[in-house]
């Protein structure tokens, strides 16, 4: 419902992991292995992104399936059923394909891509922290997604905790807050030359 678009559950811990875009898959694999998650629902922005990520997980023997609009209804139902029955560890989904997914006791929801529409964040993570259980909403954020992250924080009226993962510290830093001067993009390196040539 529209009234709940900016509400997130009290039982959800939110974590932002700043990381360079090119290393997102590597970081996700590291988290899955080190945190020993039983299962997790992972959101990507595009169908192609969902397929690509699922193949990367398969390569390192993480049992996963992808669901999106290009999959047949039958394929989607089978993947969902396998996930509900603990036959697969990771379900990679797009926002559209995930509509109507009802999985009880989902401990982790991971935003591999920051949603372009802030209220989709609320819908995505609403699948964890149910029934009195604690849940985790983990978002991998690259520097170019900072504006989208700020939109989410404004919507839910909450500053989300940034946690850098050792070995995955980003070259392009995700700022804590908007800079008054847009030229200072707060990067360690990579944007310096371009910034010098920009006027305002």
Protein language model annotation of sequence segments:
Residues 1-173:
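Conserved helicase RecA-like core
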Residues 173-200:
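Intrinsically disordered, Lys/Arg-rich low-complexity segments
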């Amino acid at each position: 419902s529209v009234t709940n678009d900016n509400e997130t559950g009290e039982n959800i811990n939110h974590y932002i992991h700043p990381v360079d875009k090119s290393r997102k898959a590597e970081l996700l694999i590291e988290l899955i292995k080190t945190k020993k998650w039983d299962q997790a629902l992972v959101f990507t922005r595009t169908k192609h992104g969902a397929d690509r990520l699922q193949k990367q997980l398969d390569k390192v023997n993480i049992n996963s399936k992808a669901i999106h609009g290009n999959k047949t209804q039958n394929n989607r139902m089978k993947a969902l059923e396998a996930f509900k029955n603990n036959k697969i560890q990771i379900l990679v989904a797009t926002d559209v394909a995930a509509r109507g997914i009802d999985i009880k006791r989902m401990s982790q929801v991971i935003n591999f891509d920051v949603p372009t529409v802030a209220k989709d964040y609320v819908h995505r993570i609403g699948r964890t922290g149910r029934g009195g259980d604690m849940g985790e909403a983990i978002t991998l954020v690259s520097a170019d997604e900072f504006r989208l992250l700020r939109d989410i924080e404004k919507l839910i009226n909450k500053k989300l905790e940034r946690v850098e993962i050792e070995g995955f510290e980003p070259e392009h830093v995700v700022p804590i807050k908007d800079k008054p001067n847009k030229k200072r993009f707060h990067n360690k390196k990579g944007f310096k030359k371009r910034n010098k040539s920009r006027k305002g």
